[in-house]
Every structure is written in C-alpha cells, then in structure tokens.
Amino acid sequence: ANQITMEEKEKAWKPVSSKYLFRRPWLTVRCEDMLLPNGNHIPEYYILEYPDWVNTIAITKDGKFVFVRQYRPGLGRTSYELCAGVCDKEDASPLVSAQRELWEETGYGKGNWQEYMVISANPSTHTNLTHCFLATDVEPIDHQHLEDTEDLSVHLLTFEEVKQLLENNEIMQSLNAAPLWKYVAEHAADFEQESVEKVEHEKTETISHRINDLLYYQNSISRSLSRFLKDEEVET
C-alpha cells in the first residue's frame, strides 16, 4: 500500500465515535460520527468493511480469454465476468487467492502470472482493495470445484468478442471492466496486426490455391491436346 501523504493527513476525517451495526463473514458495517477538517460534522457516516478481492484476466495458450457467466441477483441479470473472489485468511497472498479462485471456478491453472493493477470498488465507503491479475498460457488442469452458492458456466472468448462486450456495455462489473479496458488499450494494436497478417496469409493461400488449380487445368488441357494430336497422327 502507498504511504499516507502529508495532504492526506491534513484532509483526513476524524471519527469522534464509532460503533458496529452489522457483522458477517463477508460484510461488516460500522457507523462513525465524523469531524471534517473544515469543521463540518457528519453524525452518521457508514463504512463497509470487506476482505480484499481478486480477479484475473486469464488467457489460454491459443489466445482465448477464460470467462464465467452467472446470474447476479443485485441487478437481476446474467453477465460475463472474469474469475473473481475473496482473499481468504488462509491464503498466503492475493496471488494465491487468485490462483485458487481460477482453479475452483473454471478448472484452469498453471501459466504465467503477474499483478496487473490494484483498484478500489468505492473508496468513499469500502475499506478493501481489489487485486487484478493477468495470467497467460493457462490451461485446463481439473474440473470445477464450485461452492454451494455458485452456479456458473465457463466460456472461452476471443479478443474481439471481449472488446465487443465492453463496447456494448455487456460487462457491467466495474472491477472487471477496468483491467479489461486497460488490457484492450495496451494490446489492441497487437491483435489488429495479427488480424491483418491473418487476412494477408489467407489471401496468399487463396491465390496460391487458384494458381495451383489453373496449373492443374492447364496441364490437363495440355495432356488432352497431346493425346488428340497423337490420335490425329495415327489416323493420318
């Protein structure tokens, strides 16, 4: 975590009093009586305490993006999402949490991992951070190990399909959209170049096939003409 700056110290709100209203494994709510540096007073300010979260942009060896699709009761919608979850207390690090979640939800693993970015869902009220990882060359190593609260399917999407989902606002989870947009911005040119090279390769192959076909027909005609001339000579 970044060190607190002098500006942050000067602008920090000071809790006069604090009390917990709600405690659950995945959510704790506390109410604070806040005093602002400008002298203003907020008698009820609610803070939501969460464990840190993780998500992963997982890409297979052949360039497919590993997504899950599941129903979200908050919005009442089904959506494509990155594999994500909570940092358990038993996990040694956010990286371990991300690798565990990918294995549990999709059965994918191995590959090359790096922390891609760290973001906050809502710094106004949330205490936690989300650690976003990039994992390349992942591969299926097992079946899913879903919890009782999970009901999701695994989908492999191309770069263009992911980009289209983002542009159509079909990836609604902001903690997913942020690292995905970053990845698209950084790698769009690479994929466009690959697409151009693929098209050029296909054109070259098509031309090559047509030339081979023409040569075949030309040889066939030559052989037929040769046989015809020989037959004419025999008759003569």
Predicted regions and their residues:
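Conserved Nudix-box catalytic region and its N-terminal flanking loop in Nudix hydrolases
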Residues: E10-A12, Y45-Y50, N55-R100, V138, ...
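Hydrophobic residues on conserved beta-strands that form the core of alpha/beta folds
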Residues: P15, V29-C31, I42-E44, V68, ...
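Active-site-adjacent beta-strand/loop module that shapes the phosphate/pyrophosphate-binding cleft
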Residues: D33-N38, N122-D142, H155
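Local beta-strand/beta-hairpin segments that build beta-sheet-rich folds
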Residues: P15, K19-L21, Y116
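A contiguous pocket-lining binding segment that forms or flanks enzyme active sites
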Residues: A92-T136
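Nudix hydrolase/Nudix homology domain
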Residues: I4-W13, T78, E115, S124, ...
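A generic structural signal for well-ordered coil/turn residues at beta-strand boundaries
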Residues: R23, T28-R30, D52, H126-L129, ...
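Acidic, metal-coordinating catalytic segment for phosphate/diphosphate chemistry
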Residues: K19-N55, K61
